A protein has these predicted regions:
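Noncatalytic carbohydrate-binding groove/subsite architecture in carbohydrate-active enzymes
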Residues: 15-16, 100, 104-131, 150-290
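Glycine-centered structural positions embedded in regular secondary structure
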Residues: 2-4, 174, 325-329
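Non-catalytic positions within long, well-ordered alpha-helices that form the structural scaffold/packing
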Residues: 22-23, 68, 215-218, 304-305
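Short acidic, glycine/proline-rich loop/turn micro-motifs
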Residues: 41-46, 86-89, 145-149, 236-240, ...
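Acidic-and-aromatic substrate-binding clefts and catalytic sites of carbohydrate-active enzymes
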Residues: 6-17, 37-41, 51-58, 84-85, ...
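Aromatic-lined substrate-binding rim segments of carbohydrate-active enzymes
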Residues: 19-25, 29-111, 126, 153-188, ...
Length: 349
């Protein structure tokens, strides 16, 4: 089972520091967002060509190259609709061909066979390969995909599932169209809970309802299903079964696996985001430093025992400075290692 981290802020802005920590943590994989809206700020003339002038892959190239130098695999998340392709980053592209061709260009660039010449004074080099791909992030959460629900005549349906079926189908088709082989594309990346309340001020979709509707929406092909089984409150351990039937945490991950089995057969499961915030500084959701370290071991044990889980990705290497953000890192915002850092180092891979 691959164990790794997801921390775009540190990986992109403090790359050398981040990879020193990842290497020390014995990370086997790092999740990296390829922001479509940032890479392609204008419509490319030849969208299937990774070298089209509209594309700016500089930051992604650097991170992928550093991961390869440190012998860490990359899980690349394609997310974010550009303004030229749709209304907003968290909206369905107007043309799914645009997303499919971007996914193709990204997978071709990071196929392990693509040659680039950074400048006249630098030699031609081959970019490293990325074999693990993820379509979008938490599409059952309105922060990442809108609208969540839509009314048809007298009934409501989770529009997010229908839109996401198109998104993941486009990413899957684009990545696999390279023909290089070995790539795996995960769909889902679902958040742990949702209210299924279309009339509420902030409607969202529970993961079991979401995956049930994905099948009806026409999603047929994907290589693995991804989920983010976060705890509901700080009193829950990784083994705690949540009270709400709308939540899928690590404690009841079996209900999601059984649902997937009934709809898609025995798909592999990727945990592409997980973590526990600490107190200090988070007094509402945080647990003690010692508890966070203990839960690292417990979460790893649950995931390994499940056997269908291929990876466990912890959210954040370093705490975010703003208290409204996340403090689930294994390093504090001031740069001090928490006990959970040592817990990751001691995990038996």
């Amino acid at each position: 089972m691959l164990v790794g981290f997801h921390d775009d802020e540190q990986v992109y802005s403090r790359t050398a520091w981040a990879f020193r920590q990842l290497r020390s943590l014995r990370a086997g994989i790092v999740r990296v967002t390829i922001d479509w809206a940032n890479v392609a700020r204008r419509r490319p003339a030849a969208p299937a060509n990774p070298s089209d002038r509209a594309y700016n892959w500089t930051a992604v190239d650097h991170v992928v190259s550093q991961a390869a130098l440190n012998k860490i695999r990359v899980l690349a998340t394609i997310y974010g609709t550009p303004r030229w392709a749709g209304r907003a980053k968290n909206r369905l592209p107007r043309r799914m061909t645009d997303l499919r061709l971007f996914a193709y260009a990204a997978a071709r660039r990071y196929s392990g066979n693509y040659r680039v010449k950074p400048s006249e004074n630098e030699p031609v080099r081959v970019l490293p390969a990325v074999r693990h791909w993820l379509a979008w992030n938490e599409p059952n959460n309105p922060v990442f995909l809108k609208p969540q629900w839509k009314r048809f005549r007298t009934k409501w349906r989770p529009q997010s599932a229908f839109d996401y079926a198109k998104i993941c189908s486009a990413v899957w088709a684009g990545v696999h169209a390279t023909g290089f082989g070995g790539e795996k594309v995960a769909c889902g990346a679902t958040g742990p809970r949702g209210n299924d309340a279309p009339r509420s001020s902030r409607p969202s979709t529970s993961p079991l309802v979401f995956v049930s509707w994905l099948r009806r929406a026409g999603l047929k092909r994907f290589d693995a299903y991804a989920h983010h089984p976060y705890y509901s409150n700080r009193l829950e351990r990784p083994t705690t079964v949540p009270r709400s039937k709308k939540a899928v945490t690590l404690g009841n991950i079996g209900v999601l696996i059984r649902k997937l089995d009934s709809l898609y057969g025995r798909k592999r499961l990727w945990i592409t985001e997980y973590g526990y915030q600490t107190r200090p500084p988070d007094r509402r959701f945080g647990v003690r430093y010692a508890s966070q370290a203990r839960y690292v071991h417990e979460a790893f044990a649950v995931a390994r025992k499940t056997r269908r889980v291929d990876m466990l990705v912890w959210f954040l290497v370093r705490d975010e400075r703003r208290l409204s953000g996340w403090q689930s890192g294994v390093v504090s915002a001031r740069g001090v290692r928490k006990p959970a850092f040592r817990a990751f180092q001691k995990l038996r891979r």
